């Protein structure tokens, strides 16, 4: 039995002995996706015990945090309207593309613990959705960092994002393209880059806007980030304002007002782009 089959056998045995520990989606991935297992083995230099421990940890986290149980409508329109995460487009090599917009990154560390945890869960949900979409294939994540200020750098939040990616994206095939990184935030960004594992650090490329089309055609990028595509809508159908989502009623209304005030420009862009005059509520 080779290492992949050995790892698969051990994880499936664990799942059988602990039926509530791993989500059925992940059990199916373990059964059918060799690449999923190979990445953990490669990340841990074929140390089967370490790979097994890391993989089981990831699968338990995915289940306990309910990442497979969520859909777009779980999260508030405010988060989508900012346009910080863009799951859209294909690269010049026909790879899946994900965009991150630095100037629209919110700072949630100064808000309530509940808002912080919701924002972190939103990132994890987007991560998982994208992870399943690319299905082991190489991909490109571009970060448009022009006009990004220090108010967009939330070190406490970003460190948790880095820790999550380090733990759950072993031997990643994603290339990170950082575009127009200004000198003001370069120091902070470099601190975060240094926290990434070696494999991820080696996938980072710095570029200015003139190099973007070497990777992604402009018609595969939304107009609001400098592309030419007008078909992308940041706010998915059925998504409502956080103020009227029953499962988010524990977050005070003033917290939502603070999110809107802090990120007003990006949110207004998102509303205009989606053909809306206001954030969708229970009546829209």
Which residues make up each language-model segment?
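Basic, amphipathic alpha-helical/coil surface patches used to engage anionic, phosphate-bearing ligands
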Residues: 1-284
